[in-house]
Amino acid sequence: MRAAMNFRINNSLLIEAERDAVLELRHAMHREPELSNNEWKTQQRIRGMLERFGLKGATVFHNTGLYIDIEGSASGPKRAVAVRGDIDALPIQETRDDLPYQSHVEGVMHACGHDLHASIAMGVALAFHRMRNNFAGKLRVFFQPAEEAEPLGGRTVLEERLLEGFDNAVGFHVTPSIQVGKFGAREGAVSKSSDQFKVTVSGSAAHGSTPHNGIDAITIAAAFVNEVQKVISREVPVDDRSVITIGTIHGGEATNIICPKVVMEGTIRTTNPELRPLLSQRVREIAEGVAALHRGKAEVVVTSGEPAVINDPEMVRLFRDAVSDMAGSDALTQGKAISGSDDFGFYSQCIPSIYFWFGSGEPGNESGVHTPTFAVSDDVLIPTTELAVKYCFDLLHGQSAR
């Protein structure tokens, strides 16, 4: 028996047609995954399903995304809550041929569970549309494109002020590190910010036998790689978990030529918003300083990515209550903060937010996200959707997280 069958959540918040739609969308998205900023078929599929259930007037954002507003007509506090389900896939070849809904797109798969996230968001939208006479306030459901790659859909939500007037935002992510049937949420930072940098080191060429006649860009680059890590080990508090990674390094054309140019690219990650600009500044200072020390030059370009996702403590408390009510206290786990990033950080930068995890780990489904063997049982989908419905209802209907 699968662990998911032990859920106390009992399909009471979704009607049969809604449950079927959630599964239908998950399977269709998994069969036809689309990469970031190219989710055109996915967008039309989502719009079609919304309209099939009477939800018309979805608004396009970020070209390939949609959001839908559902207004409640009951008396009560007129709160506004946003829900995010991301929809993009990854450039990975799926190798799980045991799935009846295996990806039909060569080299592309839903290796991060966004097919589940979007389907849960769909279930929330359909349930609240049906129950619109039973709640007060407004629910906005985002089917957000481009979580995985720039330009990021979450940044568009921030820049176009799509959360203006909203009280709370709800996001979620599947994880095989948590057992099926369990849900996790923790207060504070649950992911790192992610900024990208490019360092171009310039020297001058010379014959390999006469290095004194040139300026060796490889030597400068090597010094930078060593020195920049001292920022983490000597300038950042040990419990901050900041990371500076050099991901690519390119330079040199021949074994007997002093290299005149090296290009390096990497990422800067931290959970501390105050450290974020300082780390970028130090990368720049070290690159320029090391280059000057060796009589070369360095040009540094830093591109801001997503901020850290920050969970609001009161929203976490209310979420734990919802899990206990629906699945029992033994279904609760704190979960571990991730070292990666998620553009839901743009949402939590705007308004009090929560980003909770739902477990998918079970025999046969242990592979991590972003791997070709990642898979999640359908069994987790409906219980998680119903929990999301219950939680959003609590936020909207008199269970203020503020």
From Swiss-Prot:
Keywords: Hydrolase, Plasmid. One of its GO terms (molecular function) is hydrolase activity. It comes from the Bacteria. Its EC number is 3.-.-.-. The keyword Nucleotide-binding does not apply. It is an enzyme of class 3 (hydrolase). Belongs to the peptidase M20 family. This is Uncharacterized hydrolase y4tI.
